[in-house]
UniProtKB/Swiss-Prot annotation:
GO MF assignments: ATP binding; tRNA binding; tRNA-uridine 2-sulfurtransferase activity
Stored Gene3D superfamilies: Adenine nucleotide alpha hydrolases-like domains (2.30.30.280), HUPs (3.40.50.620), Translation factors (2.40.30.10)
Name the UniProt record assigns to this protein: tRNA-specific 2-thiouridylase MnmA
Domain of life: Bacteria
Amino acid sequence: MKAKVIVGMSGGVDSSVAAWLLKEQGYQVEGLFMKNWEQDDHNDFCPAAKDLADAQAVCNQLRIPLHTVNFSKEYWDRVFAYFLSEYEKGRTPNPDVLCNKEIKFNAFLNHALNLGADYIATGHYAKNTIEGSIGYLFKAKDREKDQTYFLHAVEPEALSKTIFPIGDFTKPQIREFAKQLGLVTHAKKDSTGICFIGEKRFKTFLNEFILAKPGEIKSTGGKTLGQHDGLMFYTLGQRQGLGIGGLQNSTDEPWYVVDKDIASNTLYVAQGSQHPMLYSQGLICGPIHWLADYENHLPLTCFAKTRYRQTDQACMISPPDNNLHYVIFSSPQRAITPGQFIVFYEKNQCLGGATIEQIIR
């Protein structure tokens, strides 16, 4: 009898096909739907009820059981509280990374093991290899959809208990499988944005949890150009929503956010998409979460991404200094954002990553 695998069923096409592929390979397959957010019952946040119905319909079609579990408290404590605290500091967090680390490959994994699973599986576009109790992470075949950026913080031990069934396929192939099988999710749109915000405007959502502190918008030369609604609403490189067009004695070039001074609550902007203040030669990151044995090989020349879907950028990682690493790039990088993550690669292997703490201009 093949191993028992519990698949995280999101109600989307990727996890639907992942479950089918595992069943085709002879595994004992069961599904599990996680509810991670409580406040979607009375408003327009994540359509959890619709997703659950789709997950149940797919499991019925595949003739596999579906478990449900509520991780809302774990999500609030381990992901959302961090999300809010980072925004309060004027930084731009990435909750998807923490959700994978704390919920999908921790709370879900432990719950599945308690249900008798040998492995969990998800619909992530990624690959892994397993050596004993350690798993190694690799890019998916579909480079456009590769999600290793969001998986870099998962523990190697958790990766050794994980199967990524769709890592060797492209998104169009997955859609075609689902269509041929007649799965109800075959034409369902991919989810985008931060899950707990749903269709709600980001500014409206944040205002429900954090008190906004308006302040001055200044040019890099120190001239006051207007007022911002609160530093938490802006990210480096942002162009839209600044409300400072048509200023006297300025060109028609668009304005971009180039810096945030938390101490003075000032938003700094500059004109032109190629303004030097938009670019950085490097960054300082926190402790690196390693997924491969490179910790003792620093300084290390490798590749990195500072945001999802960015082309890999050549860089050098310094040895740690008070748990911080200096990362210098071969060419200047645009709009590196503190609070986001830098993720390191060597060819197709994901080496790990860290939180971006500071920019080096």
